Design a protein with these regions (language model features):
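An acidic- and aromatic-residue-enriched active-site/binding cleft used to recognize and process polar
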Residues: 1, 35, 64
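A short SAM/SAH-binding and catalytic strip from SAM-dependent methyltransferases
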Residues: 1-11, 38
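Non-membrane alpha-helical structural segments and their capping/turn regions in soluble enzymes
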Residues: 10, 14, 42, 46, ...
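A short glycine-rich, Lys/Arg-flanked "PGG" loop and its adjoining helix->strand segment in the class I
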Residues: 12-26
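Conserved Class I S-adenosyl-L-methionine
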Residues: 17-18, 42-63
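Conserved beta-strand signature within the Rossmann-like core of class I S-adenosyl-L-methionine
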Residues: 27-34
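A mature extracytoplasmic/lumenal domain signature
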Residues: 34-36, 78
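Soluble small-group transferase modules, centered on the S-adenosyl donor enzyme superfamily
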Residues: 58-158
């Protein structure tokens, strides 16, 4: 959809998600892949999830193993979970079905908050850069710790 580090503001607002909601079938689901996940209060993830939860009746998240992504599922369908499980049961590809069962096990209901993005207020660039700074800081901490405990040879694999 885009090639920048952060989501374009026009794809992150209440107005945008309301438009998506209008285009879904009655029990349709919107799925969003959030890259650069952060658990910090006031993060872009909190803003995006709060915004989506303000539009849709149900918002659930699932972390993606082995990276910084989180999948967000939004729907207005009261029977979304039963439909999800039934759909898994109808899959003929066993590996895909196993993966979707794993996703289901990790689904966490999301309670929306007050961090709402609108067409008039969506500082996604600033929020995205905060997460990027956090990720870089975490990586730097690893290398600093390696340098402290094992010296330069630890960093060079010696």
């Amino acid at each position: 959809a885009y090639q920048d580090i952060t989501i374009p503001f026009q794809l992150s607002s209440v107005e945008f998600f309301t438009e998506v909601q209008r285009h879904l079938k009655p029990n349709g689901v919107m799925v969003v892949n959030l890259n650069m996940t952060s658990a910090e209060n006031g993060s872009i993830n909190e803003y995006l999830c709060d915004t989506m939860a303000s539009v849709f009746k149900y918002t659930v998240t699932a972390p993606v193993k082995g990276n910084t992504n989180t999948e967000v599922f939004c729907t207005d369908a009261d029977d979304w979970e039963e439909t999800f499980l039934r759909s898994i049961g109808n899959l003929t590809d066993c590996d895909y079905a196993d993966m979707m069962r794993t996703v289901h096990e990790k689904l966490t209901p999301y309670e929306g908050g007050a961090c709402i993005l609108t067409d008039d207020k969506a500082p996604v660039e600033v929020l995205g850069m905060r997460v990027l700074d956090e990720l870089i800081g975490d990586e730097l901490k690893y290398y600093k710790d390696e340098l402290k405990t094992g010296g330069l040879s630890a960093l060079l694999g010696g």
